[in-house]
């Protein structure tokens, strides 16, 4: 059974975006990170948690603990839609392979077009294929 697919179906059915899904090595702990344009509330987390608990019971998904939360201020960017939605925000990106001896970049996300992500950094503009991103997240504003 594809547990992540099941979680995605439940979360999107409730009107939320599944940002990330993590399980412990033995699958005993499940972490679900949700988001919505207006921001996630504690009640939203409870609603998703209750619905997932019911679905897991019906589908016989074996687990010990379920955690549902917002992705936080340093939200990870994983999908192409994330790179469009957060254009204009400051991001931190780690690439799989270096560009000019550099794998880590911090800059303002200019967006994504035709599979290429563009950043404006202190050292100038940089562009790289979306598929080359190992990890990306928002830089919190304080």
From Swiss-Prot:
GO-annotated cellular components: cytosol
A biological-process GO annotation: translation
Signal peptide per UniProt: none
Gene3D superfamilies (alphabetical): Ribosome maturation factor RimP, C-terminal domain, RimP-like superfamily, N-terminal
Subcellular location per the Swiss-Prot or TrEMBL entry: Cytoplasm
InterPro entries according to UniProt: Ribosome_maturation_RimP, RimP_C, RimP_C_sf, RimP_N, RimP_N_sf
Keywords: Cytoplasm, Ribosome biogenesis
SUPFAM superfamilies the UniProt entry points to: YhbC-like, C-terminal domain, YhbC-like, N-terminal domain
Keyword Cytoplasm listed: yes
Predominant subcellular localization, coarse grouping: cytoplasm
Function field: Required for maturation of 30S ribosomal subunits.
NCBIfam families, alphabetized: PRK00092.2-1 (NF000929)
Membership in a protein family: Belongs to the RimP family.
Name recorded for this polypeptide: Ribosome maturation factor RimP
Organism, as annotated: Aromatoleum aromaticum (strain DSM 19018 / LMG 30748 / EbN1)
């Amino acid at each position: 059974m594809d547990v992540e697919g099941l979680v995605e179906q439940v979360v999107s059915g409730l009107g939320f975006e599944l940002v990330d899904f993590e399980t412990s090595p033995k699958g005993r702990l499940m972490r679900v990170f949700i988001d919505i344009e207006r921001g996630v509330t504690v009640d939203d987390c409870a609603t998703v948690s209750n619905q997932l608990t019911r679905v897991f019971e019906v589908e016989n998904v074996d687990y010990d603990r379920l955690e549902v939360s917002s992705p936080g201020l340093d939200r990870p960017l994983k999908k192409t839609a994330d790179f469009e939605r957060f254009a204009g925000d400051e991001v931190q990106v780690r690439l799989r392979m270096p560009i000019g001896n550099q794998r880590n970049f911090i800059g303002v996300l200019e967006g994504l077009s035709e599979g290429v992500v563009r950043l404006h950094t202190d050292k100038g503009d940089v562009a790289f294929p979306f598929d080359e991103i190992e990890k990306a997240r928002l830089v919190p504003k304080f």
